[in-house]
Amino acid sequence: MVMIKWMENKHKGRNGSSHDFQVMISIIKNGTSKEGAEKRAVAVRFYHSKEKEITNTGRLQIGIDEETERIYFASASGTKGYKLSGSKKNVRVVQFMPDDLSKWESYVGGYVLQQDLDCKLFYVDISERRLV
């Protein structure tokens, strides 16, 4: 089972307002989280320093290899302007994908995530904060 939790932060700084948010991806095995099941979680932070609300319709692509418990991320089309970061041993942050999907081959991360990984793929809708 995969769970997603959102955390948002709005603040004003020297360069104007900033709106960032973090998405926590959890893999839960052997029961529910309330039952103390084994859980592997990782946080990924998006941030946008421009004076814009996050109304983007882009999607974040998540690949989960349940056997090795590694989590792979790549931004999907429409998420330009956001930076993706993750820093855990079981996480591999993959490069941003171009909007033009025909150019994926030149973006190694997107190509690897689509073609070479034996993992389940999920998408998070950024504007609606949910799995799609």
Residue ranges and their predicted role:
Residues 38-55, 87-104:
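Short beta-strand-centered segments at strand-helix junctions
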Residues 100-114:
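Low-complexity, intrinsically disordered Gly/Pro/Thr-rich segments
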